[in-house]
Amino acid sequence: AHARRLAAEGALVAVNDRVASPALDELAHEIGGLPVPADMADREAVFAGLDRASEHLGDVDIVVANHAYMSMSDFLDHDEDDWWRVIDTNLGGTFWLIQAALPSMRRRGAGRVVIISSEWGQVGWPRATAYSASKAGLISLTKTLGRELAREHIIVNAIAPGVTDTPQLQVDADAAGVTLAAMHEEYAATIPLGRIGVPEDIAAAVAFLADFRMEALVGQVVSVNGGSTRTRA
């Protein structure tokens, strides 16, 4: 949804997934963009991907760090490999992605970085220890880089989505032994807006934060969750 929204507003978009696939190629073709498969936990792959994007599309001036890896288990069941896979992908991958894109933004004299964190990075979530910690780290990265890069007109902000209607929700429903409709209803009951999010909600926020006419919002976290965090202590 983010890629389609930015392309519709005139951006040349490089789209990423961990591995090459027909679906990635089809999306890139649909929006007139470029498929750039790369494992975001691999620093060399991230830098190579940015080089490929720059070679084909020109200097990068907008980065949307939307990649994520999640696992859920009781705290004592998180093993070392699982912990580092989550941290290296979510937090490390974003760190490398911004490092790789920064020279392009400096050449252009401006840039926009939109980091996709999570509501769980703000409030935490049981059994999602590594994921929540990684997403909280992204919020700190946003605030720090926001302060560091703003004078160069490179503006860094984050989005913290709440529960959103993606394929992961079906996985969660199956794991809980309930129907998808029941899970929608359960989550919606806790959200002041009365519904869970949809990808287009997040895409609209991405487009806003990527807009070069908007510069005074720096190092902020935009909570796109229908007001759900306002219902918690």
Language-model segments: what does each one mean?
Residues 1-14:
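Canonical Rossmann dinucleotide-binding motif of NAD(H)/NADP(H)-dependent dehydrogenases/reductases
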Residues 98, 134, 142:
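Active-site helix of classical SDR
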Residues 74-75, 79-87, 183, 187:
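Substrate-binding pocket helix/loop in short-chain dehydrogenase/reductase
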Residues 118:
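Residue(s) in the substrate-gating loop at a strand-loop-helix junction
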Residues 103, 147-151, 215:
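Alpha-helical segment proximal to the catalytic Tyr-Lys
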Residues 78, 124-132, 144, 172:
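Active-site loop-to-helix junction immediately N-terminal to the catalytic Tyr of the SDR YXXXK motif
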Residues 123, 207, 218-233:
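Short C-terminal tail/terminal secondary-structure segment
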